[in-house]
Every structure is written in C-alpha cells, then in structure tokens.
Regions:
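A cross-family kinase active-site recognition segment
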Residues: 1-38, 48-55, 84-90
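All-alpha amphipathic helical-bundle segments outside canonical DNA-binding/catalytic cores
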Residues: 9, 141-152
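Active-site acidic catalytic loop and adjacent metal/ATP-binding pocket
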Residues: 42-98
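Active-site activation/catalytic loop segments of kinase-like enzymes and analogous catalytic loops
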Residues: 92-138, 152-168
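Short linear motifs in low-complexity or flexible loops
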Residues: 177, 187, 193-195, 201, ...
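Residues at flexible loop/coil and secondary-structure boundary positions
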Residues: 181, 198-199, 214-215
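Hydrophobic alpha-helical signal/anchor motif
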Residues: 183, 208-209
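Short, intrinsically disordered C-terminal tails of secreted or membrane-associated proteins
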Residues: 216-220
Length: 221
C-alpha cells in the first residue's frame, strides 16, 4: 500500500490466471506445424500449488534484464524492463526466469537455444539459484513447488516463442498475398507519392523505393 502499487494486485488466483492465460495465448498462436502440448497443459492444470503470500514481482526476471557492476560482475546494480511487473507468486517468477537458464551440463539440444552466458565457467546451476533464493528469503521451496514453477516457465517460454513464430508467418503471408506483380504496383505507387515537382522520384526516395522492392522480390517470386 505504501508503494502506491496496490492497483497491480488482482487478488487471489495469480497462479491459476497465469496458467490459464498462457494456455490461451499458446492456443491462439498455435500453427499446424507445432504440437498441442496437451499433456503439459493437463499437468499444469492439475498440479497448481498453494499460492504463497503475494509480493511485488518483476514478471520477466532473467539474466539479460540485469545490469552488472563493470568492476564486480557478481554485483547487480540495476534491473531493467519493469513493464510486466505485477503482484503475484515470486516462486513462479523465478521459475519463469530459469526457463532461459541453460547451464554447462545441459544436453546439446538445450544448449542450442541458449541466449545468455549462463553456461560460462563459474555460473551457478539452477539448483544453486534456487538454494540461494530460498536462503536469502529464509524460506523452504519444496521440490513440487520448484517443479511446477520450472514446468510453467518452460511452457510460458514456448508460448512466447510460438507467438513470435505466428507473427512471422502472418507477416510473411501478407507479403505473399501481394505476389510479385503486387510489389511492382506498390513500388510504382510509392514512386508517385514521393515524386518531386519535376514529376520524377527524388534521388534518395527512388533509392529507398527500389531497394525495398528488390529486397522483397526474391521472397515473393
């Protein structure tokens, strides 16, 4: 209440809302080339833990949202990207962040999607992150709580990736709908719109228009 952020609190049911929300987002973004995650979805719906007392959470807490001290990289001096911040279960927030955390002994297929230097020498394992978090807060995180948080976090990450995949396919579909001839027509319309007083495209505008057209033509046929 003192922070003035009480409006972010939607009340009890945070875990249920998160699970249901990401099931819905994945379903809406699903394309024919991916699975339905039916077993994972059923498990998440059936194994939701008792919620802990809510706290202010970042909701996108991961390594590449941290600012480290240049002189001492083990010291965090800032946390970025608070636009998703809310009031909810911090265990779920940590599990979501650890979905990005590939450690040095993870198998090759996991290493292939690593985006952060979490496998570098000296970096903590996920076990060590959980232990440090529990010790810092003076709490015990049960194995079932941790498992649920990590499964949810991985499913959430799959949902994010699928949303991006869907957006890319949708954008490409719009481009393909124009066809090669459509690109030519759009280029001519742009030329006309950008024409100078002498009736011809100005030099820089002409370069932009034809660079755009030439870049798209190999994709559109």
């Amino acid at each position: 209440d003192r922070s003035g952020l009480r409006s972010l609190d939607r009340g009890p049911g945070y875990v249920e809302r998160q699970v249901g929300g990401w099931i819905g987002r994945y379903g809406r973004a699903r394309t024919p080339d991916v699975g339905d995650f039916a077993a994972t979805i059923a498990w998440l719906q059936a194994n939701q833990p008792v919620e802990r007392p809510p706290t202010m959470i970042h909701n996108d807490f991961r390594f590449d949202n941290l600012v480290l001290d240049r002189a001492d990289p083990t010291r965090i001096v800032g946390v970025l990207d608070w636009e998703l911040a809310t009031v909810g279960d911090p265990i779920l927030d940590l599990g979501s962040g650890l979905a990005y955390w590939c450690q040095a002994d993870d198998p090759e297929d996991v290493q292939a999607i690593r985006l952060q230097p979490t496998n570098a020498p000296g970096m903590w394992t996920r076990d060590q992150v959980w232990t440090a978090y529990a010790d810092a807060r003076g709490i015990t995180v049960s194995p079932t709580e941790r498992l649920f948080a990590e499964v949810f976090g991985t499913f959430r990450l799959a949902g994010i990736a699928q949303q991006l995949h869907f957006s890319l396919l949708f954008a490409l579909g719009l481009l393909l709908a124009f066809g090669g001839q459509g690109v030519q027509q759009l280029a001519r319309l742009l030329e006309f719109a950008l024409a100078g007083q002498d009736g011809g495209p100005q030099g820089l505008h002409r370069e932009i228009v034809f660079s755009w057209r030439d870049a798209l033509q190999p994709l559109l046929g």
